[in-house]
């Protein structure tokens, strides 16, 4: 059996490439790369001549089985992404899971990860955090996630592209409130690296005046008790009445309101029963 190595590569500054990563890429039989042309430049810089094979979102299902067969035949393979740690908002999880099922050894070669670099530089709480990658561009799942993040007490980390940054900041302000603190990290480890700190409201103003360029990582403060909305029993009764008047059953209305308020569904269902008893 061969070994699968998960090799982290620099996210911008080539000086962040570790000696262990270079040695691993030099000695494996094959490098599975998200973009072979991009990785080829990295390999050339470090005088690494190991052959490559592509492994990306569009071919990973079929390629996973191909790589698995090579590993089972005794080849050692290194998996790399375009930048940072493979499997973090990049292909890799499926191959690692397949190796686990086949009892193939997986060894991580740690290194740069944008989300950790942004987090530790943010000045926000680092003891508990949640990473959500890129927000969905589809309206319903995007709104559902933002709704849940509004009450998330852990520090929140997101990635975003420059052309979507303002839309994401605006949506975050809608769901999390304009005074929520955040740090916007841009072009981490690169020449134009920047950290901007403020609130969602001031972030929107700043990036409206300063056109977003580069790759962004948003680190957002978790919710505090003051951020949590309070609901009176009468408010909840009114909401249930409204939902049931639209044709939802007691169960459906209770479930929907539970999702919106984060209150226990059983509590809301009991209120709906009381509404019926009250006539």
From Swiss-Prot:
Pfam families: TP_methylase. This is Ribosomal RNA small subunit methyltransferase I. GO terms for biological process: siroheme biosynthetic process. Signal peptide: none annotated. Keywords: Cytoplasm, Methyltransferase, rRNA processing, S-adenosyl-L-methionine, Transferase. Gene3D superfamilies: Cobalt-precorrin-4 Transmethylase, Domain 1, Methyltransferase, Cobalt-precorrin-4 Transmethylase, Domain 2. PANTHER family: RIBOSOMAL RNA SMALL SUBUNIT METHYLTRANSFERASE I. The lineage of its organism: Bacteria, Bacillati, Cyanobacteriota, Cyanophyceae, Synechococcales. PROSITE patterns: RSMI (PS01296). GO terms for molecular function: rRNA (cytosine-2'-O-)-methyltransferase activity; uroporphyrin-III C-methyltransferase activity. Catalyzes the 2'-O-methylation of the ribose of cytidine 1402 (C1402) in 16S rRNA. It catalyses: cytidine(1402) in 16S rRNA + S-adenosyl-L-methionine = 2'-O-methylcytidine(1402) in 16S rRNA + S-adenosyl-L-homocysteine + H(+). Belongs to the methyltransferase superfamily. RsmI family. It is found in: Cytoplasm. The gene is rsmI. NCBIfam families: 16S rRNA (cytidine(1402)-2'-O)-methyltransferase (TIGR00096).
């Amino acid at each position: 059996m061969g070994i699968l190595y998960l090799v982290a590569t620099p996210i911008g500054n080539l000086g962040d490439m570790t000696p262990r990563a270079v040695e691993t890429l030099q000695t494996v039989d094959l490098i599975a790369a998200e973009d072979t042309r991009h990785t080829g430049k990295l390999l050339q810089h470090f005088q690494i001549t190991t052959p490559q094979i592509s492994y990306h979102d569009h071919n990973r299902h079929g390629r996973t089985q191909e790589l698995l067969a090579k590993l089972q035949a005794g080849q050692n393979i290194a998996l790399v992404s375009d930048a940072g740690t493979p499997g973090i908002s990049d292909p890799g999880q499926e191959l690692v899971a397949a190796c686990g099922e086949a009892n193939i050894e997986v060894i991580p070669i740690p290194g740069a990860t944008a989300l950790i670099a942004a987090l530790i530089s943010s000045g926000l709480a680092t003891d508990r955090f949640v990473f959500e990658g890129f927000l969905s561009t589809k309206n319903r799942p995007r709104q559902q996630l933002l709704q849940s993040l509004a009450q998330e007490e852990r520090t929140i980390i997101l990635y975003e592209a420059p052309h979507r940054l303002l839309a994401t900041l605006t949506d975050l302000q809608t769901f999390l409130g304009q005074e929520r603190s955040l740090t916007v990290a841009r072009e981490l480890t690169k020449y134009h690296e920047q950290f901007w700190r403020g609130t969602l409201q001031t972030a929107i103003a700043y990036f409206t005046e300063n056109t977003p360029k580069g790759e962004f990582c948003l680190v957002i403060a978790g919710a505090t008790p003051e951020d949590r909305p309070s609901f009176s029993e009468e408010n909840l009764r009114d909401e249930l009445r409204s939902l049931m008047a639209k044709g939802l059953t007691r169960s459906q209305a209770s479930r929907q309101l539970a999702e919106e308020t984060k209150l226990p569904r059983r509590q809301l269902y009991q209120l709906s029963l009381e509404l019926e008893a009250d006539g």
